[in-house]
Design a protein with these regions (language model features):
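Basic, glycine/lysine-rich polyanion-binding surfaces/domains
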Residues: 1-237
């Protein structure tokens, strides 16, 4: 029995000779280039990373807003908005898709504890949960040219006035049904895409090709960790 969960992009990462590291039971690329080169690329151009290891829970129910208010103290549930919540000293992110459906994103390996907590506090809320961590792949695009790269394939406008920070939408992306959310990393615009894992390699290669004009650089776990840490520290200042 394989003790690790695998990203749908693992074979692609290995073909490029990337060092693979274990993160919360997932095998993920440690880095594609030097840490300094990846940081410089995302600060000056655009970087792309594999987010497939993130926990992903689909929540549905007519009483979902009331349930989330009671259990996670999310008092303002608005479709199209993202809400950051602390759980066990870690940040989880709620993406309100519709009035009765949401996608809950957790750090790798935390989807189980979060789902257990929600189930234990379900009561008579008539809300259902589905762990879709293994069924959905995820990609991060961050940097000054991330918006231009995304706009090449997105059916909706990602202009800042139309799609500001902490917003989410379901749309067609390169002819693939996807959930796109914007969560900037400090001053860097950043977008996350979630979609059926069967399209992971297609979208990765499509974005790599389209991003050449913007000097797109694949990012490893080390760089993503530093970016997230820096964004968290700035938000706490």
């Amino acid at each position: 029995m394989n003790p690790y969960s695998t990203s749908p992009l693992e074979s692609h990462h290995r073909q490029l000779g990337v060092d693979i590291t274990d993160r919360a039971g997932w095998r993920l690329p440690d880095r594609y280039s030097s840490l300094e080169a990846e940081i410089a690329a995302v600060q000056q151009h655009v970087g792309m990373a594999d987010l497939s290891a993130k926990g992903k829970l689909n929540l549905k129910g007519a009483f979902l807003p009331k349930f989330l208010d009671r259990v996670l103290q999310i008092q303002s549930y608005l479709p199209g908005n993202l809400t950051s919540v602390e759980f066990n000293h870690q940040k989880i992110l709620l993406a309100a898709l519709t009035s009765d459906e949401a996608l809950l994103l957790t750090p790798p390996g935390q989807e189980g504890p979060v789902m257990d907590f929600l189930s234990q506090n379900l009561g008579e809320s008539f809300v259902s949960f589905v762990d879709c961590t293994g069924g959905l792949a995820g990609l991060l695009l961050a940097g000054p040219h991330s918006r231009s790269t995304i706009a090449k394939f997105c059916a909706l406008s990602v202009h800042p006035h139309d799609f500001p920070n902490f917003h989410v939408a379901q749309t067609s992306f390169a002819k693939v049904r996807a959930t796109i959310l914007r969560r900037d990393l400090g001053s860097l615009p950043a977008f996350e895409l979630y979609f059926d894992r069967s399209y992971a390699q297609y979208l990765w290669e499509t974005l790599l090709d389209a991003g050449q004009e913007f000097s797109l650089q694949p990012l490893g776990c080390q760089t993503v960790d530093l970016l997230l840490k820096g964004a968290t520290e700035k938000s706490n200042d």
